[in-house]
Amino acid sequence: MFYRKYRKTILPALFLPLFLIVWELYIRLFHVPNYLLPGPAELADSMVKLFVSGDIMKHIRVTMEEILMGTVIGIVIGLIGYIMAKIRFIERLIMPFVIIIQTAPKISLAPLFILWMGLGIESKAALVILVVSFPIMINEVSAIRSIEDNVYNLMKVLKASKWQTFCKIEVPYSIEMMLSGIKLALTQAMTGAVIGEMIGAKAGLGYLLTLGSETYDIKMILNAVILLSVI
């Protein structure tokens, strides 16, 4: 009875300790060198040292700033989708350029942003803006277009103003899809920031991934991966 009641809590709680035990046993039984795969305790010790020295906080802060800046601006730009949904001419004007940019691999655009804006957070934030704005824009267009004409006709019969129609109809209809777009955009924002940092940066968790790869520091790579997963 107890197990059935708390099964959803017990199983996830047991997975991590079991995973760490299997990890440690694998290293000991097969004598895996620590430069290929360090043990859990050794990796945790290196993580603690990074936090104690304060070095890692700089990289976390830079990555978070890039994600936050790019996401906020990307959301604002994504709201252009409302204008595109209301004015067909604007959609026909903007959408082809948006699609062309989005079909291009983001990793191929990162060097351009770095060349134009330098190695600072601006180039990485620009890449985040690019990946964030598209899903929000598309979801906003789809949401507004999904509102039936009968709903608008009813508001006209009630002599509602455009502002009232916007607040009472368009916002409630579009909020769910917009939040869905933001949720998708947040996962892509992390990817955009890390890609930019890996290609060219002075700091950031993506920069640590590249630095760890170049210096064959597996602990640095794994610590960066863990922190990115937590963030």
Segment roles from a protein language model:
Residues I144-I147, L154-S174, E214:
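Short helix-to-coil transition segments within interhelical loops
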Residues A126, L130, W163-G196, L227-L228:
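Transmembrane alpha-helices
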Residues L29-I73:
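Periplasmic/extracellular loop-to-transmembrane helix junction in inner-membrane transport proteins
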Residues I99-P135, S142-A143:
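Generic hydrophobic transmembrane alpha-helix motif, especially the helices
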Residues M69-V98:
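Transmembrane-helix boundary motif in ABC transporter permease subunits
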Residues G206-I231:
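Hydrophobic alpha-helical transmembrane segments of polytopic membrane proteins
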